[in-house]
Amino acid sequence: MAAELDAPGKSTRGRRAPRLRAWHLIPLLVFPAILIARSGPLPGRRDELLWLTDTRTRPLEPRLSVPAADVHRPYVRPREERPSIAVPLRELARLEESGDRAGIAASYLLHGDPQQGLAHLAHAPPSLNRDNDQAVAAFLLKRNDEALTWLDGLLETAPRHPQALWNRALVLREMGLHLLAASVFDEVAALGEPGWSAEAREQASWLRASVSQRAESWNGTRTALTQLAQDANLPIPLEEARRHPGISRGLFYDVVRTAPTSARVQALLPLAELLDRIHGGTALADHTRNIATRDFTRRAPLAAEYARLLRERQPASPDYLTRLRGAGEHDLLLGARLLTPEAQSPPEELERVARQWNDPWIHLLVQDELARQEGLAGEAWQADQRLKAALTLCREKRLRPRCADLLRKVSHRATSANRLSEAEDTGRASWREAQAMGEWELESAALRALAQAARFQFRVASARAYLSEYLARAPDTCDVKNYVHRNIAALELMRLRPKEARRALSRAQECNPSVGLIGAWTLTDLMRLDPRPEDAEQISAELTRAHATRETPGRRMLAQLVQARFELLKDRKQGNARLAAVIRQAAPYLNTDADARDTVAVAYQTMAVTAGEAGAFSEVPGVVADHLGVASPKQCALIAAAEAERTVVVALGPRGQVLGHHDASRKEPLGDDLSGLVPEKLLTLLRSCPRVEVLAAPPLDSRSGLLPPEMAWSYRVAMDASPEPKKKPPPPLHVVVANVETPSGLGLARLSSWESTPAPIGQSMELSGAQATPSRVLEAMSRATDIEFHAHGVVDRSLSEAPVIALAPEYDGRYALTSEALKQVRLEGSPVVLLGACSAARLPPFLHQTSSLPQAFVGAGARAVFAATVDIPDSAGRFFQGVRERIHAGATPAVALRAERLRWLRDVKGAPWVTRVLLYE
């Protein structure tokens, strides 16, 4: 049910379509063939049928780990997508007889059915080869991020695994990371495998040549235009400008500004007219003619000084800016102001100067700069709106180079706001646009944006790949090396690899000792995990530089947080005081600045785990409760927090007894299942509680397994606002959303409601078919006291960071119920909500915060929400029906969930998924 939007599938009608599982396939399709297996084809022909070896070209470009399927033959990319070939059922039966799941999966992959291949691989024994073939299936399904993660993990264990190296190169090539792909093909070539090595050398050569040609062409144009701004005697580079009009137009304004005479400006007119023809309009030609009429006895000295600033990359002095204002040389003034972002000037000056000529390119440059200034002033919403308005205008004017740059800026701001799906989408759009135009520098900038969007989503393999490609494009540039390696150090620390993080940070410092705020953050953790004598001095120096730099409020808060965590290493009392001060200082920015929210989250996490480290377990409940915005519990509660390798859990017994446990030995990041995190001694204390309230700080909230299935427990979630005590509650209303007519393009089956008795009191309302639109559902829910969803959970990152519930489309095509939409409504009936949607509780992978549909429902006023963190089978309807009926019979939600969970684990075969159904209250 939960599905990526691009997953193949056809719409069906009626009740829930059965999920295809690997163990469904063989009994229905293969075992009949066993009856005639001994009369089948000869062994050689069997191999041809299974592995498609009877053709001169191979059917798949990636390599499988089954030796019979990994014979080299040339590969010819099909001009159009080929339909899958029928699998040989009789031959698959032979593999089934021998228990060869990997072979069955490989045959399905070769025959063009990666979904079936994945289903069989899920039941194959764990191995490196299985990981490789799972990566192949993901690659064929265009899930490159997933494929790269499988392959990188495999290659850490077996660096010379031939198939994995080959497949990694293919994935990187399809991601557009051609230099990195070429280097991996080099590794394959070095293995000396017949056929494969030669093809790998050809691939590497072709990839490098294509990148080198683009880089040389773009750099040639940039050099020609840059030199033109410094030497008025050079010829006008019309051919170079025609090849790369984006960088040419960007530099053309400086060429005009530095021209020493009217005649030289007039000589630039052919270049202006060429660029106008390409971009549309007459702005550059008009501007050139206008500047040619200026009095160059006054302008020439000012132009010469501007040329010096460009050459030396220096900001303009206040005196120079004053002289430009007095002379009325508006184009020079604008250029000097853009060279001097910290200049003190009237806030409206840039827009006033830009209005001196009718040039949308200049207007967009000014809007970009004004958005930057608004961001620094803490006006994040205004900055976002200004950039998006500029992007809209840019598209209208078809100024593609400016649009690519604005997309990258929007991506950066979205990353800063933890709108990570938007950040990735706009970053990738910038990358594609820049590649299409051959704008080398914009491509590199987009790679940085993509790397940051991936890093903040814990997508380590992709983030590392983007960073490595960025470095490969400028391997000898100090700033690039420093940037890449300090970010890789942060990635390694996210994986709890302190030695590797230290090594990356050392590489970052090879040409520049400063590693910025991110490096200071990393060093603060390394002082605990892998200390060096020089760390304290380095952190102090970085913080001094950070405090002296003009930054956004959120970045300033992050610097204060690093300072507080640094102090905490030396003195817990003083460090806690600083952390508390940081939390207070960040409060005004929490609604608008994600860096401020991250600061507060990490500050609370740090206070909690260090309290546990000090044995002050009685402090932990208050810290985590403050973080979550709920009252601190007194009894029958579990409180949990984690930060990096450290975890603290505290149990409050039925009489308020406090028992805690602190652990700092973890070597791997926590997974989605937290089973075993709470020691048995704490569980023993909690077993006598009728129900346990769990307060878990991000990133532990909304994960399964924190407590065992025999306990009645739920996650405590804060409401966004206090209920209105004087308002009369609405009458009982049972709302059911089922049989939804989702957009046909999603390929989702209709899901019927469960066969359950109606709500015992009050009215029932079912929203189904085309009537179950987001707006109608939200309106009905606002008065409901009991809500059931029988709908698909869908991952659509263009709509929400969390999974969404797929509903019927509105008139404008909107079909998704999102957590963001829930935050805008109030559920007046304090309903119990059953989310019969796959993975409705699955979390978006934020670095320090979490957000999910169930949390949004509770925040909007729901009394209790049931949801699963995994894909659930068709039988889930009966499970949720049982839970609801127990609640209507008088059980509390937590007790009802436990009772039904234990019944299913006892009586229903293959129901471990019930332990992944969580309750939020």
Range-by-range predicted roles:
Residues 99, 129, 163, 199, ...:
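Residue register of alpha-helical TPR repeats
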Residues 25-113, 270:
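Juxtamembrane extracytoplasmic segments of single-/few-pass membrane proteins
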